Amino acid sequence: MRDRITGAKALMRALQAEGVETIFGYPGGSIMPVYDALFDYTRGEKKCFDHILVRHEQAATHAAEGYARVSGKVGVALVTSGPGVTNTLTGIADAMLDSTPVVVIAGQVATTALGTDAFQEVDLVGVSQPISKWSYQIRRAEDVAWAVSRAFYIARSGRPGPVVLDFARNAQVEQFDWEPKKVDFIRSFVPYPKFDPDSVRQAAELINHAQRPLALVGQGVELGNAQEELKMFLEKADIPAGRTMLGLSALPSDHPLNVGMLGMHGNYAVNLKEQECDVLIAIGMRFSDRVTGNLKTYAKQAKVIHLDIDRSEIDKNVKAHIAVVADCKESLPALTALIQPATHRVWRDSFRELDEKERQKVIEPAIHPQSGPLLMGEVVNAVATQAPKGTVLVTDVGQNQLFATRYFKYTQKRSICTSGGLGTMGYGMPAAIGATFATDRTVCCFMGDGGFQMCIEELGTIMEQQAPVKMILLNNNYLGNVRQWQDMFWMRRKSFTKMLNPCYELIARGYGIPYQCVTDRTNLASAVEKMLTSQGPFILECAIKEDDDVLPMTPPGMNVNDMMLEI
């Protein structure tokens, strides 16, 4: 018996077949047939999706990112054409740079109107191709099942990333005989390359002869679900490991081989030791400029082993002496089997003196100040101290991101959501919304007053969904990171970084969200406890010292061993 359905209904079935449970979206004219079909799939006996109505399409993509980061599934955003889809481009680019699997489905004008500058017509395939893994226009209803299956396969396979589907309106309403499709192979796409055993043997030989090995751990470990394989490798060879910002929860904070965060605002010892190690093992990381500093002088003394699933990352920034191109879920066990048990106690102990120097000059003054206004570090520390085990950290971008990632504690995998590659202000709140739909764990979102106001409309989404986001607003009345750079490198000429802020208490009250403001550190612990024990969303505003600076810091263009502990 024939099963004739519309392209819009076919989309519902195709999403259901991919295991989609949550959709973040905003309706509009060219996507209305899909939203009409969605109506039946979000209520009653047919219910299989939760649709989260955001207040801006950019938030739909960031929420899908947060959902994907924490759940390990593909996030889905659904929007209309024209400004609806152009609003998603920042989120698509963010997902591309941070390897986040997201499928953005957008309405489009009918195929008969393409190229006529019709109302809300945008060449979505053209504008999204450079910032997505695959971008495709669905022109016929019968192509829906194939396109959706292919989109999800590409988004989640290999190095994950965003995929864009441009859904012509006529294809949404056309009827056809439904036939499910499953794409699990694309001839020109090799998502999981098989590693070369010779490369693994050579890497093992280098590691076995190393006196000062250092591992650099990136998000690829989390994306490959290789946290346990990483631990076994590090522990057998006794190798200290630094983590990138996106890889922070790949190794627990309290693991004895964890030596801190990499990067220009990372930990002092691990940055300096990159210039002293004799073997550098990069695992699922891409040698970002925020990690390496000046490439001309970076780790020139070391033999570099690079394990990555994406061949294009090999030799892109740092020349690898040995490359192992494969999923680290497979390559790490193979490497572990060939390395010899080792002890590098003297090398590991050499980190401690530098750690102590950072603790005295930077960490203690930041998290345990004796007087003066509140500092960001002490607020982060207060939240981290009381937060339940497994809490998910979400940050916006700016000083809030740098303080939060430095001083939070990571005990469980997939516990960090932040915009690493693109550095997107306004990311935090919607990403935190997405995270709450991916997990029952506590979600804490740190934002500055600048980023908070870039996504403030999403308080409406939080209100409507009662999403239990614990929002910590670090309010210093400045665009703090830019202000710090102006003070350090631009002769203190604070050009348009001072902010006149609204009354956040009135805003919170308008959205019906519990709120408390802390201006004195004697009230900080009790306010944090109140926030963390609340049942739904909560805004904790903290009045922060205006010139609170993030340290340590590697000045731009300098070497990682030029890291500054004081200004």
PLM region descriptions:
Residues 8-12, 16, 34-38, 355-438:
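Active-site diphosphate/adenylate-binding microenvironment
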Residues 21-22, 69-80, 85-106, 129-182, ...:
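Structural signature of the thiamine diphosphate
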Residues 69, 219-305, 411-441, 453-457, ...:
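Glycine-rich, anion-gripping cofactor-binding loops and their flanking helix/strand elements
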Residues 105, 113-120, 271, 276, ...:
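Thiamine diphosphate
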Residues 106-147, 247-353, 528:
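Glycine-rich, acidic loop regions that bind phosphate or pyrophosphate groups
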Residues 2-93, 97-98:
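N-terminal cofactor/phosphate-binding cores enriched in small/glycine residues
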Residues 1-2, 142, 205, 301-397, ...:
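Phosphate/pyrophosphate-binding active-site segments
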Residues 169-197, 202, 347, 358, ...:
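Aromatic-enriched
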